[in-house]
Amino acid sequence: MPRIWKFGDSVNTDDILPGKFAPFMAGEDVFQTFAFHYVRPEFAAQVQPGDVLIGGRNWGLGSSREYAPQALKKLHIGGIVAPSFARIHYRNLLNLGIPAFEYDLTELLEDGDEVTLDAQTGLLTYADGTVQLPPPPEFLREALKEGSILEFFKKHGRFPGEEPGAEASTETASAAE
């Protein structure tokens, strides 16, 4: 069963994946094994698909390096819940199909607690009950069904939330490639 990994306030992108372990430095196939290398050295070896990260305020601040959320995607993180996110990092998470919920669970759940998170509805279930997180917007639920916004675009030829049958502009299509 998925479990909680709890972090504090102001977890930055270098905490998530230190720059010296970026894909071009460590290698495309292994860079995710350095996730939280200095903050939680055991993380990459012990994290399981579907595990949920609980953070404090301002999760993902710092540089806009996309390889930090890419490492979490490669580790199959089930979602991240924090009271607030750095906006660029939040958008990178959504672009990659990593559910991110703005909600404060820091007092409710502890490291290692077993949970299930329904990314489509935002329903988080734990031993003592459930919490209804703010559900993702419809466009994101569409993207999550395909794995990410890019995968949705590749399959449907449009972005989530756009009307089916509406052609993406040349500018929009070029940006997705």
Swiss-Prot record:
It catalyses: (2R,3S)-3-isopropylmalate = (2S)-2-isopropylmalate. One of its GO terms (biological process) is L-leucine biosynthetic process. Keywords: Amino-acid biosynthesis, Branched-chain amino acid biosynthesis, Leucine biosynthesis, Lyase. It holds the Pfam family Aconitase_C. InterPro entries: Aconitase/3IPM_dehydase_swvl, AconitaseA/IPMdHydase_ssu_swvl, LeuD, LeuD_type2/HacB/DmdB. One of its GO terms (molecular function) is 3-isopropylmalate dehydratase activity. It is an enzyme of class 4 (lyase). The keyword Amino-acid biosynthesis applies. Residues 157-177 are annotated as: Disordered. Its EC number is 4.2.1.33. It comes from the Bacteria. Pathway: Amino-acid biosynthesis; L-leucine biosynthesis; L-leucine from 3-methyl-2-oxobutanoate: step 2/4. Gene3D superfamilies: Aconitase, domain 4. Residues 162-177 have a biased composition (Low complexity). HAMAP family: LeuD_type2 (MF_01032). Belongs to the LeuD family. LeuD type 2 subfamily. Heterodimer of LeuC and LeuD. Catalyzes the isomerization between 2-isopropylmalate and 3-isopropylmalate, via the formation of 2-isopropylmaleate. This is 3-isopropylmalate dehydratase small subunit 1. It comes from Deinococcus radiodurans (strain ATCC 13939 / DSM 20539 / JCM 16871 / CCUG 27074 / LMG 4051 / NBRC 15346 / NCIMB 9279 / VKM B-1422 / R1). The lineage of its organism: Bacteria, Thermotogati, Deinococcota, Deinococci, Deinococcales.
